[in-house]
């Protein structure tokens, strides 16, 4: 999560 619109690992910023 974080800057990603779906749950999972925040690999993309």
Curated annotation (Swiss-Prot):
Tissue: Expressed by the venom gland.
One Gene Ontology molecular-function label: toxin activity
An annotated GO BP: regulation of blood pressure
Superkingdom field: Eukaryota
Main location: secreted
Membrane-crossing residue ranges in chain numbering: none
Subcellular location: Secreted
Annotated keywords: Hypotensive agent, Metalloenzyme inhibitor, Metalloprotease inhibitor, Protease inhibitor, Pyrrolidone carboxylic acid, Secreted, Toxin
Keyword Nucleotide-binding: no
A cellular component annotation (GO) from this entry: extracellular region
Modified residues (Pyrrolidone carboxylic acid): 1
Function description: This peptide both inhibits the activity of the angiotensin-converting enzyme (ACE) and enhances the action of bradykinin by inhibiting the peptidases that inactivate it. It acts as an indirect hypotensive agent.
Similarity remark: Belongs to the bradykinin-potentiating peptide family.
Name under which the protein is recorded: Bradykinin-potentiating peptide 13a
